[in-house]
Amino acid sequence: MTLRIETASNGRTATLRLIGHVESEYLDELRALVRTQRPRVVLDLHEVTLVDGAVVRFLIACEAEGIELQHCARYIVEWMNRERRREE
């Protein structure tokens, strides 16, 4: 399965719904899309089934920039927490 991205906006907030496998090969496209969706961006991860390490680091950076992560699977949250602790 590949990554599919659905975008919804109400004028103030853009929600990017990520569906499927989010792997490092898609990060350039995802970064560019996030940049064009300002001022407020939400990443909805409800239908994400797989991520890799580069994506976890990208999600950590997104949070640091104020991007909200919604419906993030427990394994991704735990992986992000481990990465943060490792960087300390």
Language model regions located:
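Short beta-strand/loop segment at the start of cytosolic alpha/beta domains
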Residues: 1-14
